[in-house]
UniProtKB/Swiss-Prot annotation:
Gene3D superfamilies referenced in this protein's UniProt entry, alphabetically: Ribosomal protein L17
Pfam families named in the record: Ribosomal_L17
UniProt-recorded name of the protein: Large ribosomal subunit protein bL17
Gene Ontology MF: a single term: structural constituent of ribosome
Record-stated family: Belongs to the bacterial ribosomal protein bL17 family.
InterPro entries hit by this protein: Ribosomal_bL17 (IPR000456), Ribosomal_bL17_sf (IPR036373)
HAMAP family according to UniProt: Ribosomal_bL17
GO biological process annotation, one example: translation
Taxon lineage: Bacteria, Pseudomonadati, Campylobacterota, Epsilonproteobacteria, Campylobacterales
Gene Ontology cellular component annotations, sorted alphabetically: cytosolic large ribosomal subunit
Keywords per UniProt: Ribonucleoprotein, Ribosomal protein
Keyword Glycoprotein: no
Length: 116
């Protein structure tokens, strides 16, 4: 049973799941809006919102923590300098998930996840 489990496995190993979330979060930060499956979007929401909260502190330790999670200089710079300052006054809820369509190949529900 998966009661109170805490996260979705997404059918991947832990390292693959970590890489997936890292790559999705980099894409979301760079583009502001991406389309993915609903399950991935829900996991990504948690991951990205924690990063934005850390980046909002706007000190060197926050910068290092965000870079450690993303491993992308461009995405880190954009998150710390452009995105996080917009959400300093906001207490969470930095992303929005909008269900879009059912994917033709496997009939899974797709969704847009975007920064609010």
């Amino acid at each position: 049973m998966r009661h109170r489990h805490g996260y979705r496995k997404l059918g991947r190993t832990s390292s693959h799941r970590a890489a997936l979330l890292k790559n999705l979060s980099i894409s979301l930060i760079e583009h502001g809006k991406i389309e993915t499956t609903v399950e991935k979007a829900k996991e990504l929401r948690s991951y990205v919102e924690k990063l934005i909260t850390v980046a909002g502190k706007n000190d060197s330790n926050a910068h290092k923590a965000v870079f450690a999670a993303l491993q992308s200089k461009e995405a880190t710079k954009k998150l710390v300098n452009e995105i996080a300052p917009k959400y300093v006054e906001r207490a969470g809820g930095y992303t929005r998930i909008i269900r879009t369509r059912i994917r033709r190949g496997d009939a899974t529900t797709m969704a847009f996840i975007e920064l609010v």
